[in-house]
Amino acid sequence: MKRTFQPSRIVRKRRHGFRARMSTKWGRRILNRRRAQGRSILCA
């Protein structure tokens, strides 16, 4: 059985990147929550 984590920079950015977060209402909520926490890194 292969490992579940098969790294891909393209898939990582498309699924969890800034523009992916901004494209949905819930994604923007995630960003706002992370900003409120004071995170320096908001997303992948």
From Swiss-Prot:
User: Which GO cellular component terms are attached?
Assistant: ribonucleoprotein complex; ribosome
PROSITE patterns in UniProt: RIBOSOMAL_L34
UniProt keyword terms in alphabetical order = Ribonucleoprotein, Ribosomal protein
Example of a GO biological process term:
translation
Q: Name one GO molecular function term.
A: structural constituent of ribosome
Alphabetical list of InterPro entries matching this protein: Ribosomal_bL34, Ribosomal_bL34_CS
Q: What is this protein called?
A: Large ribosomal subunit protein bL34
Q: Does the keyword Plastid apply?
A: no
Q: Which HAMAP family match?
A: Ribosomal_bL34 (MF_00391)
Task: Give the similarity note.
Answer: Belongs to the bacterial ribosomal protein bL34 family.
This protein's record includes keyword Ribonucleoprotein: yes
